Amino acid sequence: MAEELVQSEKLLSLDPKLQEDFQQKVHDIRRKRKANALTPGVIYIGHIPKSLIEPQLQEYFNQFGTVTRLRLSRSKKTGNSKGYAYVEYECDEVAKIVADTMNNYLFCERLLKCEFVTPEKVHPRLFIGCNTRFRKPTKPAVTRYNSKRNKEEVKKMTQRMISKEYKLRKRLAEKGIDYDFPGFAAHREMRKELTCDANTSVSSQDPTPVCTPTVLERRKSVRLEQIEDEEEDDDEVVLKLPQRDDEVVVKLPQKVSSAAKRQKISKLGKKTNIKELK
């Protein structure tokens, strides 16, 4: 009351004699305005399709009346909609009409659930941050885990994991728990053994060895020996024709491979050289 009188004293009437009456009239008018002020109303909206977000909901529910505040509930972890929201209208009568009209309304293959929330049930912190723009969480732990590491970072990470494993085994031993489990240290030793065997082995059943020129030459020589053995086994090719009077056997000359040709040419060259010397 005192504040209103102070504000009304700032206004001056044209006639100084009627100043008190003027201030009283201004005070009465302002009090009537406050008495006739609209009380806001809040409605709860459930079963909202996940494709709808704040701007679309604001545009849709503004057709019933003036929407002062809107809050769509979102997940803090993923940022996706939880499927329910709270809308505040300028007038509570409009909010009640909207709740009755939109309840069980088929919208995007879903039945909307609308309820009017009484002022006693409205939490004072319900609409805090409703006007701020939503930003999707960055997930720094996921990006840090998926990032590529150099040799030094990998070494530090393995040392840290092995130290944690050692501390865990120590705590279990202090509590009298006899429990052995394969950890990072055992896996690391096993990987070292596998790498050593792969470097030293040459067999085809072992892990793939390092491809050096000596290994490649050795494999080529083994393959040539196998081809020569197969050619020695197959000396003649016999074709049996259907028998008329006498059985006819046709012998075809053996196909000579390129490796055998090279060996024959080298032998002939040696013989000619020996004859010339004689």
From Swiss-Prot:
Entry superkingdom: Eukaryota
CDD domains xref list: RRM_NIFK_like
Keywords linked to the UniProt accession: Nucleus, RNA-binding
Subcellular location per the Swiss-Prot or TrEMBL entry: Nucleus, Nucleolus
RRM domain sequence ranges: 41-119
Lineage, broadest ranks: Eukaryota, Metazoa, Chordata, Craniata, Vertebrata
Species assigned in the record: Xenopus laevis
Main location: nucleus
Gene Ontology MF term list: RNA binding
Name of this protein: MKI67 FHA domain-interacting nucleolar phosphoprotein-like
GO cellular component: nucleolus
Classification via InterPro entries: NIFK_FHA_Ki67-binding, Nucleotide-bd_a/b_plait_sf, RBD_domain_sf, RRM_dom
